[in-house]
Amino acid sequence: MQFKISSEYKPSGDQPEAIEGICSAIRQGSDAVTLLGVTGSGKTFTMANVIEKLQRPALILSHNKTLAAQLYGEFKSFFPNNAVEYYVSYYDYYQPEAYIPTTDTYIEKDLSINEQIDKLRLSAASALMSGRRDVIVVSSVSCLYGIGNPQDFHSQTVQVHVGQQISETRLLYHLVDALFSRTETDFKRGTFRVRGDTVDVYLGGSDEAVRIEFFGDEIDALSLIDPVTGATIERLSEVPIYPAGNFVTTKEKSTRAVSLIQDDLVKQLEYFESIGKGLEAKRLKQRVEYDLEMIKEMGYCPGIENYSRYFDGRSSGQRPFCLIDYFPDDFITFIDESHVTIPQIRAMYGGDHSRKSVLIEYGFRLPAAADNRPLTFDEFESITGQTVYVSATPSEYELNKSEGLVVEQVVRPTGLLDPPIEVRPTHDQVDNLLEEIRKRSEVDERVLVTTLTKRMAEELDDFFGKRGVRCRYIHSDVDTAERVEIIEDFKNGLFDVLIGVNLLREGLDIPSVSLVAILDADKEGFLRSQVALTQTAGRAARNVHGLVIMYADSVTRSMKETIYETDRRRSKQIEYNRIHHITPKQVEVKHNTLLAELGGNPDAAKSQGRVTASNSYDVPTFIPDPSALGKGRITVGLGDDSKRDTNTAYTDGYIRADLAAVLQDPVIRSMSREQVEKSAEESRRKMKKAAAELDYAAAARYRDEMWALEEYLKVWKND
């Protein structure tokens, strides 16, 4: 099937020239071209038209999950009949394995997987392996991390067709090799069930199942079914059943891998003994021998990705396979917001390598663990082929790579102008901003406020909320699905003011925003550079009443450059509108199709007044009293001490003894249920923040606090 755009709009403004310029450069064999497009000029629509004209598979690379979700929704709407896929990290929380030598602290890997995103990742790999040419994958930098060999993924795909001669038993063996597991009760993604001559397979990358009906040793019928009701959706003549996971291998490769791991273990043990590291040698021997037994018996072990080099057949130092290897040779890469995405790609390898080196040095992992890693920047460049850099503020790197092939897209199809910029003093800036917010709330328009710190964003949210303003804040500590849902609620008018730090700068498409307020605009730095200010100001460029207010007591060089460039663009846009008799018109709000797939609620309650994420609980008549009554663990007893029988063993619930200290805190014991709930959430937030900052010891501490508080809540009962 060919790419075919479904849209009521046609390219206009600067778009036709930009589309032709990019297509011409790609057809002539240019390695790179830059699309310099202002906010609201329809860069995504331009990319879609380039894909349609060139008819080549495409990777759309974004620098964070929120923007990837937005792009995914837009491309799904442009190409409803083509394979538009979504590929981001499937971890809601991820703390990698680490060792801190200074405190002799080993931290095990801890994670939480989002099943919906896992499904979408498998769907992306399956679409690329299907042989289809009409595939677009919208991805974060997660596509640079190692996954299974695409040849193994393809070879373990189970091809079935009506009339095929195969026994039911043999088919079941193939399904197990493809990482499906058998079940009779819990029918879910990645499982199959057998009922007489019928085998139902719940696909790994879909919400549908395949029913295979046998007549003897022949497949008699195939159908796509609803896994819940069993109702037939479609009759099939053939269907490929792709593996239920990305990391698949063959028995032969597994046997060879075990042998190679044993050989490398011997070498590393000899090395440790030769330099007098007996403890490290003993530690490594125990770990690897245990893992080998697990692999032999079960086919896997915890942390098996650290042995991926052996299963893939790679040599030491050779890059891992990643999603990009699943693409055909002639795919095109679009790097959205390239001025941010490129530096992020550059930084990925360093942090991973540093952590792995410590684990290897102290005997927790074999040296091969270092080859389970993200790509280096040079490796990324070597496999991406022709690339289109997309940004309103491209950096020197993109301009140099493009060798002068820069396509400018300044004029918007809607005729909208870049918003004018006003500079106002910081004295009484919050009160002044509150007045501006109320003006826009009266006419059902939205406001974005950008601060320098997360704390200030939260304090502003509290300040405005107490004054009747419907507001929310959003920053890096907010979970992925919640960020998407907050943005959707903002678009839908459930609240009027969205406050954030740097997350608001990049590509958020919110046409109802008529005011962008930049606090402390004269504090020169990363968040107030010319690039950052230009990007932030652009958030008001999709509204006919757009205005940018910079609160500052002086005008910095970055502010001057931003104001000058804005005035230049406005002059060009005004002249274009005059010549073509265009009157600026408001952009329609679009809904993000990914929200429901991530588990968000597009029909959230139409809250009146301030919107808040907190929940209310009934205050209990007493507080549970944790006390150390059991050896090795504590019993959480219920009721006041005065009501307890002296020698009674309370068995309402147990937690680990090493978590008990948290619950012995008199402050915790005096809290209401709502306060304990909030404390648990705060511990979760701190855990994620510490893990993101590679402070693994702190992350583990906050995780234990969170676990203890959650256990405390589980046994909460009213007297």
Residue ranges and their predicted role:
Residues 27-34, 56-57, 133-135, 445-446:
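Pre-Walker A (Motif I) flank of P-loop NTPase domains
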Residues 28-50:
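Walker A/P-loop
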Residues 34, 87-432, 436-442, 461, ...:
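N-terminal cationic and glycine-rich segments that engage phosphates or anionic surfaces
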Residues 57-69, 86, 277-280, 440-462:
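Conserved strand-helix element at the start of the C-terminal RecA-like helicase core
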Residues 80-89, 303, 446-448, 460-482:
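Conserved RecA-like helicase motor-core motifs
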Residues 151-155, 451-477, 708, 712:
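Conserved helicase motor "Helicase C" RecA-like lobe of SF1/SF2 P-loop NTPases
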Residues 478-500:
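Conserved helicase ATPase core of P-loop NTP-dependent helicases/translocases
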